[in-house]
Amino acid sequence: MKVTLIAILTCAAVLVLHTTAEEELEAESQLMEVGMPDTELAAVDEERLFECSVSCEIEKEGNKDCKKKKCKGGWKCKFNMCVKV
């Protein structure tokens, strides 16, 4: 009885992992397709750059030291700009 239960749970775990890996590969392949528009990525880049610059300028006008705003998603704030890490 125990062996059957362990076998069923193992098969279920393998199936879940396989499905997750397959979905991830499919998502990556869609991103890697040639000719896919990057306009959305460019818009995000511009937005992060703008947010970082504006945040730093506002702090400078308030006579405070410019504390760099943390950028999200693999970006960091440097020279009043968000740059990819």
Swiss-Prot record:
- Keywords linked to the UniProt accession: Disulfide bond, Neurotoxin, Postsynaptic neurotoxin, Secreted, Signal, Toxin
List the propeptide residues.
Answer: 23-48
Is Signal one of the keywords UniProt gives this record?
Answer: yes
Name the domain of life this protein comes from: Eukaryota
The cysteines joined by S-S bonds are C52-C66, C56-C77, C71-C82
A matching Pfam family: Toxin_20
Q: Which PROSITE patterns does this chain map to? A: HWTX_2
Q: Give the UniProt tissue specificity note.
A: Expressed by the venom gland.
Q: Where in the cell is it found?
A: Secreted
The family database entries (InterPro entries) matched by this protein are listed as: Hwtx-2-like
Q: Please list which residues make up the signal peptide.
A: 1-22
Q: Which GO terms describe its molecular function?
A: toxin activity
GO annotation, cellular component aspect: extracellular region; host cell postsynaptic membrane
Q: How does it assemble?
A: Monomer.
Give a short account of what the protein does: Neurotoxin active on both insects and mammals.
Stated family: Belongs to the neurotoxin 12 (Hwtx-2) family. 02 (Hwtx-2) subfamily.
The identity of this protein, by name, is U4-theraphotoxin-Hhn1a
Say which species the protein is native to.
Answer: Cyriopagopus hainanus
